[in-house]
């Protein structure tokens, strides 16, 4: 961002000086110079928004304020791109993200596309010198996520993952209680998320003229256009996602590993059973129970809501930490419950563990773009949180227990499982 600011500042000041010399004294509004306490336009973070479907539309306004501005938007649906341009006050709308990334007035991008596009676009953005906010899941395979981690490090980019629960006080508080031993020795973590994600598609038909369908498919296999159901229901199709197991599950596996202090590691054994519906293009786990065992013996049990046991029944989502001396339950809606009840107000002392504090996920990203600090949800954590869901899916598809090495990110001596860590990507989008 600094090289853009310095160039713009020079040009702006040169223009002002030239105008003053030619016309004599003039009054420049303080807002233009940033002297009113606001941020001068030349010092604002220039943002590009890639993906303006439901999620993209929902999160975009949160990134815009006095310190940032929308420069350009992109969506493979031209009508969506045009509407987003008007809605966000951007200068240009594109249907090809490469054109957006080529702009030197964009400092950072917000990626909210279907998941099969996350890694290729994020890698291209990093190579183009942009900082990156990327929605979850990180990608569709462990291998592509690792390539992205390496790329972010190589190019020195700021990265924020869309696991916004880390910026909610009740989730941070729950993890601090667990990390500081308030429930004794942790032995079990149970998470539940909504099931579903498998859908029946419509009959093949010509794509609408507003849609660049080949670009929508991108690195995924070429298939016929099967109605807008494809655009609306991609999360239930394994070519584009891993269903709610990951699309939703990443949120709570992230909190589970944050509380367990394994956010940069992972389990060593995984097993489970999923109910897969054998529907063309849509063979995703509809309901599931998967169990991950860590090196310290702690078990993370991942449930769809329909399979959840008594402590979690009735809630469509939540995280339960169980220890030798108590438990902590946390979910959305600012819910935090503890056993014993007194734990809820237990003071975390200055010398104890205090986790990274963020009270607004978008603001944390923008602040880190300015300061070059690490975000609350950096890319390595994104990789490990996503990997939990991918490992559960692999074990369930194989129908057996698998052993995992979180250091090498491989299944030692298991060729069948290792083959599921990557997939063929359609050209020219290989990473």
Enumerate the predicted regions with their spans.
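N-terminal glycine-/serine-/threonine-rich beta1-alpha1-beta2 phosphate-ribose binding loop
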Residues: 1-134, 143-158
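C-terminal helix-rich "cap/oligomerization" subdomain common to oxidoreductases
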Residues: 13-40, 367-431
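NAD(P)-dependent dehydrogenases' Rossmann-like dinucleotide-binding region
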Residues: 51, 182-200, 212-226, 268-277, ...
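A contiguous active-site-proximal alpha/beta segment in oxidoreductase catalytic domains
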Residues: 131, 139-215
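Active-site rim elements
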Residues: 161-163, 239-246, 274-279, 305-308, ...
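Oxidoreductase and adenylate-handling cofactor-binding alpha/beta cores
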Residues: 168-191, 203-204, 246-275, 295, ...
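Rossmann-like dinucleotide-binding domain that binds NAD(P)(H)
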Residues: 214-297
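NAD(P)-dinucleotide binding in Rossmann-like oxidoreductases
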Residues: 280, 288-359
